[in-house]
Amino acid sequence: VFQFLGRIIHHVGNFVHGFSHVF
């Protein structure tokens, strides 16, 4: 379960990081 949540947090973190570079 924690690995699943970790993967989601990791993907969300990458998405936010990439999204912040757009602007």
Swiss-Prot record:
GO terms for cellular component: extracellular region. Keywords: Amidation, Antibiotic, Antimicrobial, Secreted. InterPro entries: Clavanin (IPR008453). GO terms for biological process: defense response to bacterium. It holds the Pfam family Clavanin. Transmembrane segments: none annotated. It is found in: Secreted. It comes from the Eukaryota. The modification Phenylalanine amide is found at residue 23. Its main location: secreted. Has antimicrobial activity. This is Clavanin-B. It comes from Styela clava.
